[in-house]
């Protein structure tokens, strides 16, 4: 957070990059959008994993659960440009959530970015090549340890329920983001998933009128 405070004071938040993931819940994504928006960091994108086998009917190429949710929240897609900026020394801080970038963009590019950055943070559930290159790694909870929602490829918002407590020091991404907001003195608060979704449903038009109760077991379609 110290590096972000320094960049804010120097009016250099254009040199902060944030790469979110389509594996994050709607609550995680919204928390990131709100917090980095309040901070004034505008270079916030999401990245899908590599495409898998598909038939474009029942089997989708995108194996992640929430690209549609990221799009509905108005988050731009694609991490390559930010990585290239980082490798050229145009960014000073880069935060990456969940997605291993090495299989998508080569180890050489991610390594060059890591060397050029003042601070490279990876928030994720598993050890991977991107985490190995990061300067700081924060453990996050897997989906089985989270409450929240995903939006499937048809635009149906669906509930997930935590089956387990987060392992060790890991926590939901929205909670990690909430700590960052508090450390930066921001007004955005991330206390628990239901309150984040309630705010999301008030402020994001595609989700308006939804609640965990109305989503229920069947899900609810995004508004067009």
Spans of model-derived segments:
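Short, charged, surface-exposed loops that flank catalytic or proteolytic processing sites
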Residues: 169, 189-193
């Amino acid at each position: 957070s110290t590096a972000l405070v320094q960049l804010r004071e120097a009016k250099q938040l254009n040199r902060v990059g944030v790469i979110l993931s389509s594996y994050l819940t709607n609550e995680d994504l919204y928390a990131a959008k709100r917090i980095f928006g309040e901070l004034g960091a505008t270079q916030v994108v999401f990245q899908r994993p590599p495409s898998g086998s598909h038939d474009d009917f029942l089997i989708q190429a995108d194996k992640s659960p929430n690209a549609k949710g990221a799009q509905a929240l108005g988050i731009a897609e694609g991490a390559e440009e930010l990585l290239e900026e980082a490798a050229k020394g145009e960014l000073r801080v880069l935060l990456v959530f969940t997605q291993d970038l090495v299989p998508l963009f080569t180890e050489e590019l991610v390594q060059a970015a890591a060397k050029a950055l003042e601070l490279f943070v990876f928030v994720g559930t598993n050890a991977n090549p991107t985490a190995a290159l990061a300067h700081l790694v924060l453990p996050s909870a897997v989906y089985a340890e989270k409450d929240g929602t995903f939006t499937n490829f048809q635009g149906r918002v669906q509930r997930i329920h935590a089956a387990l407590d987060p392992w060790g020091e890991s926590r939901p991404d929205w909670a990690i983001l909430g700590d960052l907001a508090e450390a930066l003195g921001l007004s955005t608060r991330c206390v628990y998933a239901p309150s984040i979704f309630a705010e999301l449903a008030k402020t994001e038009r595609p989700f308006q009128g939804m609640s965990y109760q109305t989503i229920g077991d069947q899900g609810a379609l995004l508004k067009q």
